[in-house]
Regions:
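N-terminal capping/linker segments that flank leucine-rich repeat
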Residues: 1-46, 61-63, 85-129
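Conserved positions within tandem-repeat grammars
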Residues: 3, 8, 29, 33, ...
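Extracellular beta-strand-rich, repetitive "passenger/adhesive" scaffolds
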Residues: 28, 48-53, 70-75, 115
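Tandem repeat domain/solenoid detector
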Residues: 55-56, 63-66
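Short, tandemly repeated low-complexity microdomains enriched for cysteine and small residues
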Residues: 80-81, 99-105, 122-123, 153, ...
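Secondary-structure capping and domain/repeat boundary segments
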Residues: 106-176
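Cellulosome-associated attachment modules in secreted, modular CAZymes
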Residues: 172-211
Length: 211
């Protein structure tokens, strides 16, 4: 369950209806921490212009979930919705570094993560969801400077930041950056990142003197 639930905005708005002024009160709530509704009857999670402090969304094993439309959240870096047999629409973009979802027509999950200082996104929508092109094709994207490529199963999958898929994939968006934290970005950082991306080694065991 969410760590904290609190009110962040209280608004009184006057609206004319048929020449009569009505006053409405709006109380917007904010969530902090992990939003874990896994295994519940939740049907949709949407953020129509509302920003929260949620850092992770967990909606796996939700049989009735059909829509995950959680975008432009400045603190949310992870989202997962696996084993949701009715998931028809997904819209995840913002500052995500780890996404795991499986639309109902995909035979395997979409697993996206990052290596370096970038973000990933995934957009997919069947007809009637009003998401994407509504053509059962998913759009994968990488955002950030010094993008090197998408890597999957030890080899490069795409040199383009954006590409389309019609089924699941496990891929890492690789970005050059200050991998060894020495205060500068050099070819050594890029080589180290690429080695980790293709599975030659992992980031914790890289000897940067030899990279």
């Amino acid at each position: 369950t969410p760590d904290t639930l609190g009110s962040t905005r209280f608004e009184i708005q006057g609206i004319y209806e048929d020449g009569i002024l009505y006053w409405y009160c709006y109380d917007t709530v904010d969530f902090y921490g992990e939003f874990d509704f896994s295994g519940t009857t939740i049907a949709a999670l949407c953020t129509p212009g509302i920003r929260t402090h949620i850092s992770k969304v967990e909606l796996s094993n939700c049989e009735g979930l059909w829509l995950l439309d959680f975008l432009n959240q400045p603190y949310c870096t992870q989202a997962r919705a696996l084993n949701c047999p009715n998931l028809r629409g997904v819209n995840l973009s913002g500052v995500y570094t780890n996404i795991e979802v499986q639309p109902r027509l995909f035979s395997r999950p979409v697993r996206l993560n990052t290596l370096g200082s970038g973000t990933v996104s995934f957009v997919y929508g069947e007809s009637g969801t009003e998401i994407g092109d509504e053509n059962e094709t998913g759009s994968v994207g990488a955002q950030g400077e010094n993008f090197l490529g998408w890597y999957s199963e030890g080899s490069i999958h795409s040199a383009e930041a954006d590409f389309e898929i019609t089924d699941g994939i496990s891929a890492t968006a690789c970005f050059a950056g200050d991998i060894n934290a020495d205060g500068s970005i050099t070819m050594q950082d890029a080589i180290a990142a690429l080695r980790a991306a293709v599975g030659v080694t992992d980031m914790n065991s890289i000897d940067f003197a030899m990279a």
